[in-house]
């Protein structure tokens, strides 16, 4: 048999092992895995390279429409492809209007036409003003619903995202449970974080350490405990976003051991940056929950290797440079990290700390695909989409601003020596990024709808 593509001689990350083996692709799908697979129209030699499932980034902010000057589909998805991401799950906020009903999600689909370099699934918003319209987003095909119990949104803009109070969360989660949906939550205690932040500003405490102190670990842990209890009472599956502390992870682990249907994610910046580095880098490393100290980071690595964190995500949330001006307490909180999830974590987790390749594949791709029901994504296996990434191990480079594909070429990782490189990204059998040739095909990404897979 002749295939469209055969990838030869790479060390392939399979679900429970990694070995040198060939992959055959036909019609955008993985057709076979093995040796002596036959002929193909195209052959790629992956000798000396790691062949990983394309990353499924379950937490990405693309601010189009309405705030395309923050980040747009064209720049954001090119950066994703360059970083080895083949599928993103897009958050319902930062764009205007927020994605909270049928009309607003259709605006997203229209805005993205002809611009997606990678595939994308959508989350709907659970906000204070759309409890009677959640079903519209479920019917369209979102793969989950995001909400905040921390303060969010610009109160001066009517159609911006809004946080929910406990009553709104409980009622919304009840409705989502009936739809067999997942609720995703940003967990920080809104009132305590807000008051601690205002107190620090009044007293002139505006350093990175002051910012971290204004969002202490207990504010994350308390919020996680609360939403775990309320989601359980409401009968809804829960996913806790961007956990930053081992104590927060422990709450999820305890609930899981008690039988609750709950998963969680974290981000590379909580594993590779600490508060002292945050102080040096400045506002580009500001996010919430914040980047904490080295002892906290050590605990996060332990939780990751213990299997208590389900997936790693970028939480890519950029903004124009002027919004990062001023002191750390004033600046916008959000990190541009889309392009450097895979290479940074391969270097730090696999090369420096000995993580197994199958575990890396699960954290970067498989688990997120399973959590959000992306049936054709996340695995190198026959029948799955041929979404693949070539990683060159032990290949150091220093990240420069001009390497970035973002609308604004800034990142807290600029200047960092990264010990691995993404050399090729393949989406449904086509090379969409190549380290030598850039982006060789026009954007071919598609939206993935829950009910149409």
UniProtKB/Swiss-Prot annotation:
Q: Which UniProt keywords apply?
A: Hydrolase, Metal-binding, Purine metabolism, Zinc
* Coiled coil start-end: none
The UniProt annotation places Zn(2+) 1 binding at 59, 61, 146, 315
Keyword flag Membrane: no
Pathway involvement of the protein, from the record: Nitrogen metabolism; (S)-allantoin degradation; allantoate from (S)-allantoin: step 1/1
Gene3D superfamilies listed in its UniProt record: Metal-dependent hydrolases (3.20.20.140)
N6-carboxylysine PTM positions: 146
Which cofactors does the annotated protein need, by name? Zn(2+)
State the reactions this protein catalyses: (S)-allantoin + H2O = allantoate + H(+)
List the CDD domains: L-HYD_ALN
Q: Is Metal-binding found in the keyword set?
A: yes
Q: How is the cofactor bound?
A: Binds 2 Zn(2+) ions per subunit.
Q: Which EC numbers does the record give?
A: 3.5.2.5
- A molecular function (GO) term: cobalt ion binding
Q: Provide the residue positions that the database annotates as binding Zn(2+) 2.
A: 146, 186, 242
* Gene Ontology biological-process entries: allantoin catabolic process; purine nucleobase catabolic process
- Modifications made to the protein after synthesis: Carboxylation allows a single lysine to coordinate two zinc ions.
Its subunit composition reads: Homotetramer.
HAMAP family this protein is in?
Hydantoinase (MF_01645)
Concerning NCBIfam families, the annotation shows: allantoinase, PRK08044.1
Q: Which family does it belong to?
A: Belongs to the metallo-dependent hydrolases superfamily. Allantoinase family.
Protein name (Swiss-Prot/TrEMBL):
Allantoinase
